[in-house]
Amino acid sequence: MARTTPISRYRNIGIVAHVDAGKTTTTERVLFYTGKSHKMGEVHDGAATTDWMVQEQERGITITSAAITAFWKGSEKQYPHEHRFNVIDTPGHVDFTIEVERSLRVLDGAVVVFCGTSGVEPQSETVWRQANKYGVPRLVYVNKMDRAGANFLRVIGQIKQRLGHTPVPIQLAIGSEDNFQGQIDLINMQAVYWNDSDKGMVPVRKEIPADMLELAEEWRNNMVEAAAEASEELMNKYLEGEELSIAEIKAALRQRTIAGEIVLAVCGSSFKNKGVPLVLDAVIDFLPAPTDIPAIKGSNPDNEEEEMERHASDDEPFAALAFKIATDPFVGTLTFVRVYSGVLNSGDGVINSVKGKKERVGRMVQMHANAREEIKEVRAGDIAALIGMKDVTTGETLCNADKPIILVRMDFPEPVISVAVEPKTKDDQEKMGIALGKLAQEDPSFRVKTDEETGQTIISGMGELHLDILVDRMRREFNVEANIGKPQVSYRERITKNCEIEGKFVRQSGGRGQFGHCWIRFAPADEGQEGLQFLNEVVGGVVPKEYIPAIQKGIEEQMKNGVVAGYPLIGLKATVFDGSYHDVDSNEMAFKVAASMATKQLAQKGGGELLEPIMAVEVVTPEDYMGDVMGDLNRRRGMIQGMEDTVSGKVIRAEVPLGEMFGYATDVRSMSQGRASYSMEFKKYDTAPSHIVESVTKKQG
């Protein structure tokens, strides 16, 4: 089938916000306006849609849709052709930063929603940081302009001051709170109002109110100046006092937004139906198509050193990234993918290049606001759900088997908290295994393992809330009742000294013996290296090349078991530089054991130390309770990093060891009569004090 929407008219966007900015309402309005203006069941890039089946409505199934496809021709039908939006859903809670990260990884642009009253809140900063990390161009939408205390320009000031970005308003608010009526469109210098009769579908353009003209001219000048900075040519034109045309202003603002130099800002009230169609227009005008951003990078599965890339084109080999796995009771596992290049037809074979496993694509579906559409093919720039994938985890690449590539992996943080789970009945035992397996496949920051000594099932995640929700999902979705143990901290270990250690494993008693012998130089790894940095400096073949990987494996396996108290060893540099071998008795196993024996000696010779996870904690509290909250954080070995005033109270930032934060949610509520709230995320590992080391080593026996 031929492509019906050219890739230049695609917009893969996310609507991103923290908990209370009004993201859900905004997303609903986006679907309402796009669904209204585009008759479902007309021609798509695929087949006609089938409405939800009756049993689905009766059974009340809702598939957690990771992405919804919608179409838009403009609030005043000003674009000659429809643009295709893929709106990717992102959660707002900070315990799910991993969810936000994986959405941002496959987005080309984002609309960041702020509340007109509370403005930039601590959690907005987390989301903003993540968008910076993935270089996502964004627009700012200041919502809830009808709320008491709403002030568009104050929020613009906060974005500049707290987020360190240059916001450029392309609108101003007309009125605020109960009197919020609409926007001033600074590009066209018109006032825009909305009718209740069509639920704010079509903007009504009028002249700018006389009392706002001066302010509008001032902000338009700021905007034009920001546009002129896009090129020397425009700057000269601007400085010489020539008018920039509307087309020039738009093109320049688009260029600077995509380059990440500025963020354009608009305002409105999603709930009162005032402004969302203009947000959609701004997405088309200023956010990138897949072809506007650099080609995606990857590596050759056979040689990880070799860099490769894929351009957003149907003519390149097929490559897609699985960014979310969801379980549906009727069709099984849905694997949501973002296609970066090439074409895939249902029934095609692909390879999961990370695992080296072949997969066959059964059916493919796309989600719309009110229908699920089965499609026969996906092309570069598309987002769809594949049915029938056997063994694909979030973050893995699916690609053409003849031209494999591993797309840049997402970094998933290591879990910082663990609890033991036990099924309540024998019946639950088997179901729990299946449920945990499915949940771990969906969420790479959630791990499941069996403790070899106690036989208990241990689950690990990013915070208490993260694990609570997963246990709750196990009960709701899989009918598994389980008891939860006390939370345990996931410590780490590292060495502090450089040392040279000999590892020798010799068994020569009758028949074929074992002989492995190596000298390894150990040191703390270079800055920023978390795992093992392994170097081979053996010369003259004293240890044959084929045994070097076995030495690396021996070190890695021992690192998992630690050298101080049985916790994983991180940040280790190991250089094998000497050794010897036996013509007959040497083999890979012997060298692996020798390297493992050498690594074990690090406890004595490498100055091994225990590290504890430190969390970045932000507490928002009314001023009356600030003293209590700070005193309590100090008692928990917290280091106060800073404080500031916000509309919602005092924000206290601190770094606190995770081990001291268990049960904090309840404590902070009772300290503040339920008025304080907090968020926390993993920051770093740091040396644990001696009393913690003692109690941990005692526990490990």
Curated annotation (Swiss-Prot):
SUPFAM superfamilies membership: EF-G C-terminal domain-like (SSF54980), P-loop containing nucleoside triphosphate hydrolases (SSF52540), Ribosomal protein S5 domain 2-like (SSF54211), Translation proteins (SSF50447)
GO-annotated molecular function: GTP binding; GTPase activity; guanosine tetraphosphate binding; translation elongation factor activity
Transmembrane segment boundaries: none
PROSITE patterns registered for this protein in UniProt: G_TR_1 (PS00301), G_TR_2 (PS51722)
Subcellular location: Cytoplasm
Keyword Zinc in record: no
Gene Ontology BP terms: ribosome disassembly
Matches recorded under Gene3D superfamilies: 3.30.230.10, 3.30.70.240, Elongation Factor G (Translational Gtpase), domain 3 (3.30.70.870), P-loop containing nucleotide triphosphate hydrolases (3.40.50.300), Translation factors (2.40.30.10)
InterPro entries: EFG_II, EFG_III, EFG_III/V, EFG_IV, EFG_V, EFG_V-like, EFTu-like_2, G_TR_CS
GO cellular component term of the entry, any: cytoplasm
SMART domains in UniProt: EFG_C, EFG_IV
Chain residues that bind GTP: 17-24, 89-93, 143-146
Keyword Phosphoprotein: no
UniProt keyword list: Cytoplasm, Elongation factor, GTP-binding, Nucleotide-binding, Protein biosynthesis
Domain tr-type G per the UniProt entry, residue ranges: 8-291
PANTHER family in the record: RIBOSOME-RELEASING FACTOR 2, MITOCHONDRIAL, TRANSLATION ELONGATION FACTOR G-RELATED
Job description of the protein: Catalyzes the GTP-dependent ribosomal translocation step during translation elongation. During this step, the ribosome changes from the pre-translocational (PRE) to the post-translocational (POST) state as the newly formed A-site-bound peptidyl-tRNA and P-site-bound deacylated tRNA move to the P and E sites, respectively. Catalyzes the coordinated movement of the two tRNA molecules, the mRNA and conformational changes in the ribosome.
Similarity comment: family membership: Belongs to the TRAFAC class translation factor GTPase superfamily. Classic translation factor GTPase family. EF-G/EF-2 subfamily.
Protein name per the record: Elongation factor G
Organism: Pseudomonas fluorescens (strain Pf0-1)
Lineage, top ranks: Bacteria, Pseudomonadati, Pseudomonadota, Gammaproteobacteria, Pseudomonadales
Gene that encodes it: fusA
